[in-house]
């Protein structure tokens, strides 16, 4: 299956003006922007709406609570009209199913519903980190377990590292949307990410979207950094 891997710029900041500057400067050079916990908690939902205007929005709040609370939270977030939004797969099948129902209720059939993405294993986690929280499995084993559960419960796709793309495609096929953080261009610092790949490697593996933050936003010229990644994706 031929797919174009698209680029999400992660605007991870607590500053509304900084996020707005990044969003404005990157408008023609990325496919979407990500606003997550740091920005949303610091600046509020009105700021999310303003900064994301003119962009496809990946609203990455990773909701994880009892099913009713998560479903209600997604209903409250619906006016932001994100293209993609996240919950934790470890919340279980009922939470995922109720989340899907909430989005379908908030977005009638003739409107574009946000894609519901289930976060599997954070890209900062490795086998040792999983064992610390009582999971005696490799990251790949846990991603596959949670990925199968999430898709069967109604998630549209998954957030996973690039290392799990191939086994997920083998297990679940081409339909689930795979969004891949932990992307670092060659020569970039890995920071707190442990399971990383380059943009080109992730595209070749079959990612639908890649998420890149600090290699863009902390670059001397964020626009040039984003363009270089887009060129790498196009040639992958």
UniProtKB/Swiss-Prot annotation:
Enzyme superclass (EC): lyase
CDD domains tied to this protein: OMP_decarboxylase_like
Residues noted as binding substrate in the record, renumbered to the chain: 12, 34, 60-69, 123, 184, 193, 213-214
UniProtKB keywords: Decarboxylase, Lyase, Pyrimidine biosynthesis
GO biological process assignments: 'de novo' pyrimidine nucleobase biosynthetic process; 'de novo' UMP biosynthetic process
Keyword Translocase: no
Gene3D superfamilies registered for this protein in UniProt: Aldolase class I
SUPFAM superfamilies in the record: Ribulose-phoshate binding barrel
Family statement drawn from the similarity comment of this UniProt entry: Belongs to the OMP decarboxylase family. Type 1 subfamily.
PANTHER family tied to this protein: OROTIDINE 5'-PHOSPHATE DECARBOXYLASE
Protein name: Orotidine 5'-phosphate decarboxylase
UniProt source species: Gluconobacter oxydans (strain 621H)
């Amino acid at each position: 299956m031929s797919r174009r891997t698209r680029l999400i710029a992660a605007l991870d900041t607590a500053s509304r003006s900084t996020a707005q500057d990044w969003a404005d400067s990157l408008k023609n050079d990325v496919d979407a922007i990500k606003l997550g916990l740091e920005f949303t908690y610091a600046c509020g939902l009105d700021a999310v709406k303003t900064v994301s205007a003119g962009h496809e929005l990946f609203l990455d709040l990773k909701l994880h609570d009892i099913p009713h609370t998560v479903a209600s939270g997604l209903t409250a977030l619906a006016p932001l009209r994100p293209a993609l939004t996240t919950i934790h797969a470890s919340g279980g099948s009922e939470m995922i199913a109720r989340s899907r129902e909430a989005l379908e209720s908030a977005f009638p059939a003739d409107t574009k519903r946000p894609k519901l993405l289930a976060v599997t294993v954070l890209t900062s986690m490795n086998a040792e980190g999983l064992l610390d929280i009582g999971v005696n499995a490799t990251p790949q084993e846990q991603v596959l377990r949670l990925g199968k559960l999430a898709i069967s419960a109604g998630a549209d796709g998954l957030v996973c590292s690039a290392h799990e793309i191939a086994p997920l495609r083998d297990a679940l096929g081409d339909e689930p949307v795979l969004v891949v953080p932990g992307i670092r261009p060659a020569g970039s610092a890995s920071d707190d990410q442990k399971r990383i790949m380059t943009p080109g490697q992730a595209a070749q593996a079959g990612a639908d979207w890649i998420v890149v933050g600090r290699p863009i936003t902390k670059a001397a010229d964020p626009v040039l950094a984003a363009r270089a990644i887009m060129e790498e994706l196009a040639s992958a």
